[in-house]
Amino acid sequence: MLQTQNLQFSYKGSKPLTFPDMHCGKGEQWLLLGQSGSGKTTLLHLLGGLLTPQYGSLKIGDTDITQLKTAALDKFRGQHIGIIFQTPHFVKALTVEENLILAQQLAGVKIDKALVFNILNQLNISHKLKSKPNELSVGEQQRVAIARALINNPSVILADEPTSALDDKNTDEVIQLLENQAAEVGATLLIVTHDGRLKNYFKNQIEIL
């Protein structure tokens, strides 16, 4: 489902970052572990189509996303890749419901308010449907970010440091939530983190040195 080969990326004035080849099957759950400065967030941005590698291939299903032009890549990302950023970003003027509908619109899929409600309900956050993002707690914002990542039934879910600021109890809850929701839609889950506690949760692991 998610395959990379010979990926390489460099920021201007910096030496190239090279990444290990990956092969993550459909529905598998993976941990990508690396310390700060290892390039793990850069890799997440490459996997999500937010950066373009200077070299290498990156396939989701049968599509090499490095070959897609901007508009096609944006549409493909919206329909097939769910990204949960370390710090959630929402359109502040819109409600929770409207932010999720916007994700549907940007992906070019049919607006489905019932689906929006159902996903929020699964995450125990449907009572905040009409709330603005700044009216939510940090934990509630994280759940809405997960809902937004799931709204278009993605093939791949990428989560950036979802537990870095959490205690053990909340870490366990968030990981179970991500695993359960990924399994619900049959998506490949890849968690990118420096949090060594997560080694105990995943049998499939990649470490970036």
Per-segment meaning from a language model:
Residues 56-64:
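Conserved ABC transporter NBD signature motif
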Residues 157-160:
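Catalytic Walker B motif of ABC-type/P-loop ATPase nucleotide-binding domains
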Residues 78, 131-134, 152, 185:
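Conserved signature/switch motifs of ABC ATPase nucleotide-binding domains
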Residues 94-101:
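Short coil-to-helix segment of the ABC ATPase nucleotide-binding domain corresponding to the Q-loop/switch region
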Residues 12, 101-113, 122:
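ABC-type ATPase nucleotide-binding domains, specifically the catalytic core motifs of the NBD
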Residues 48:
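Helix-to-loop junction immediately C-terminal to a conserved catalytic motif
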Residues 132-136, 140-142:
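Conserved ABC ATPase signature
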